[in-house]
């Protein structure tokens, strides 16, 4: 029987934000598929330290012999409209959600170019495709990450490097629990105590995604099964953006 995700055995994958939620599921799924997975996450690897990213990547390449897959999964949220959001919070969100992925891509590209092959998967959000209230800067950061994916795909496709972007909807993770709790606390008239049910009812499948479902899509994009896919933004949201 052919493996579900061909071509991953023995490959080196870097996954950011790998200690919980979607990142942990991605780490586990790629490991189960035969990858040598290396994670970058707090406290050991603070992605706001942009000038250290290249050295982390180079150390992984020296240890494993290659960099074949990069999953830019780490991200932070912010809640608030434009008037409520200080510039310091804008800078924090853009640093983790856009600048760090940019620097990671810049660091892995020389290694991938040596082998004329590589797959980069960026984890955006359904907010890369649609707007949501009280989420202007987070949504803007994810839309920017999606467009970075498209441009990079055009630049580096001729050299054998693929770039794809996933756009998950609400996923059952600790981050989602924190976001829903804060929304209810700050805007109780808009987000009631049972707003989790409202979010689930807004999907065609009437539920949240599970982290493992997102991880399966990432493994597919990392593998040879998606060898003719690049520059895509793939919703995985239970039909939320189909409306």
Regions found by a protein language model. Give the residues of each.
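Conserved glycine-rich cofactor-binding loop
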Residues: 19
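Alpha-helical segment proximal to the catalytic Tyr-Lys
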Residues: 110, 154-155, 227
């Amino acid at each position: 029987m052919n493996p579900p995700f061909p071509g991953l055995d023995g490959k080196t994958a870097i996954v950011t934000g790998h200690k919980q939620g979607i990142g942990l599921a991605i780490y586990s799924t790629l490991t189960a598929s035969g990858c040598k997975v290396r994670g970058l996450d707090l406290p050991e690897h603070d992605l706001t330290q942009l000038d250290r990213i290249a050295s982390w990547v180079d150390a992984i390449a020296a240890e494993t012999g290659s960099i074949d897959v990069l999953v830019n999964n780490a991200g932070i949220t912010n809640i608030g409209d434009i008037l409520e959001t200080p510039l310091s919070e804008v800078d924090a969100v853009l640093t983790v959600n856009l600048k760090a992925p940019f620097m990671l891509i810049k660091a892995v590209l020389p290694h991938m170019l040596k082998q004329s092959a590589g797959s980069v998967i960026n984890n955006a959000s359904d907010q890369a495709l649609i707007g949501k209230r009280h989420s202007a800067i987070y949504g803007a950061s994810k839309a920017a990450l999606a467009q970075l994916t498209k441009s990079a795909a055009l630049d580096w496709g001729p050299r054998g490097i693929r770039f794809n972007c996933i756009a998950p909807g609400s996923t059952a993770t600790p981050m989602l629990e924190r976001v829903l709790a804060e929304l209810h606390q700050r805007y109780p008239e808009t987000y009631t105590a049972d707003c989790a049910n409202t979010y689930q009812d807004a999907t065609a499948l009437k539920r949240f995604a599970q982290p493992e479902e997102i991880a399966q899509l990432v493994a597919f994009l990392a593998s040879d099964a998606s060898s003719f896919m690049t520059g895509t933004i793939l919703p995985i949201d239970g039909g939320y953006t189909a409306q």
